[in-house]
A protein has these predicted regions:
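Extracytoplasmic small-molecule ligand-binding "clamshell" domains
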Residues: 29-105
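Acidic, polar ligand-binding/catalytic clefts
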Residues: 66, 78-145
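Phosphate-coordination loops involved in phosphoryl transfer and adenosine-cofactor binding
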Residues: 34-36, 140, 147-149
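Cleavable N-terminal signal peptides
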Residues: 11-12, 22, 68
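Bacterial N-terminal signal peptides that target proteins for export
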Residues: 1-13
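Short, well-ordered beta-strand segments
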Residues: 38-40, 133, 149-152
Length: 152
């Protein structure tokens, strides 16, 4: 079942990359002409995107992006497709995609309305929720217990 989910996930991502986004056409044309796929990555967003001890980009999100690259290469019937890595920061990752300096950003970027106005997102591959922690001897047991208190 996991294999079926993974195939569905990858095919969905490839569909988004190849079809849904009008801006993908110049990228696909460049790749067809022998150009490189530029994958943006983070330096230390463990476990999603980080540099290993050899300064090689690795991580869960990188693995997914490399699977997307394989699928795009297959879809375009390319014998080889060069891949370049571009290290980005939280401050420049969206601008690098907007400027066309990177084709995919493989990290832990949160999908929100403001960012969706600038770039397209795939289906989520990680979902999290906010948690609150207090000392075990605190009198705070519910969210309502924090009303009127100063929070940092």
């Amino acid at each position: 079942m996991l294999n079926r989910f993974f195939r569905f996930f990858i095919s969905s991502l490839v569909s988004l990359f190849c079809v849904a986004n009008v801006f993908a056409e110049p990228v696909l044309q460049r790749l067809s002409n022998g150009g490189s796929l530029v994958i943006a990555h983070r330096e230390s967003s463990i476990p999603f995107s980080y540099l290993d001890s050899n300064k090689k980009p690795v991580g869960y999100a990188l693995d997914l992006c490399l699977k997307i690259a394989e699928a795009v290469q297959k879809k375009l019937a390319l014998k080889k497709m060069p891949i370049e890595f571009l290290q980005v920061t939280p401050a420049n990752r969206i601008p690098m995609i907007e400027a066309g300096k990177a084709d995919l950003e493989c990290g832990s970027t949160t999908n929100n309305a403001e960012r969706r106005e600038k770039v397209a997102f795939t289906i989520p591959h990680f979902i999290t929720g906010a948690r609150l922690l207090v000392l075990s001897n605190s009198k705070i047991e519910r969210i309502e217990d924090m009303f009127g208190k100063t929070l940092v």
